Amino acid sequence: MNLIQQLEQEEIARLGKTIPEFAPGDTVVVQVKVKEGNRERLQAFEGVVIAKRNRGLNSSFIVRKISSGEGVERTFQAYSPLVASIEVKRRGDVRRAKLYYLRERSGKSARIKEKLVRKVKAA
């Protein structure tokens, strides 16, 4: 492991942020810190993860939602101080790593199947 990777690992450990396991196709709720004037509040952004970029400290993901009939995409830095929390609502079953094709789709054709999690038998 080179020096830059080591520094990034130390910085991630110092931040102490726990990011849940999620993948493209999952529906997530991202709580974002929004500053309005002198007060700060949390704003929820719920949508489907259409892309995920795993680059250590520079990891990011794109969330897409439909807001009043208009598609809205927002890119979040995973370790940003503006991201308060990430919660996985629903697991999606997709076969692609990047779901950019959802941009051209609307309505029922943009739906994503739910991933069924198998229960492990206790032996």
From Swiss-Prot:
GO biological process: translation
Swiss-Prot/TrEMBL keywords: Ribonucleoprotein, Ribosomal protein
SUPFAM superfamilies (alphabetical): Translation proteins SH3-like domain
Database matches in InterPro entries: Ribosomal_bL19, Ribosomal_bL19_CS, Ribosomal_bL19_sf, Translation_prot_SH3-like_sf
Protein origin, superkingdom: Bacteria
Pfam families given in the database record: Ribosomal_L19
Entry annotated with the keyword Manganese: no
GO MF annotation: an example: structural constituent of ribosome
A GO CC annotation given for this chain: cytosolic large ribosomal subunit
Family statement drawn from the similarity comment of this UniProt entry: Belongs to the bacterial ribosomal protein bL19 family.
Role according to the record: This protein is located at the 30S-50S ribosomal subunit interface and may play a role in the structure and function of the aminoacyl-tRNA binding site.
NCBIfam families: rplS_bact
PANTHER family on file: LARGE RIBOSOMAL SUBUNIT PROTEIN BL19M, RIBOSOMAL PROTEIN L19
HAMAP family reported for this sequence: Ribosomal_bL19
Name recorded for this polypeptide: Large ribosomal subunit protein bL19
Organism per entry: Laribacter hongkongensis (strain HLHK9)
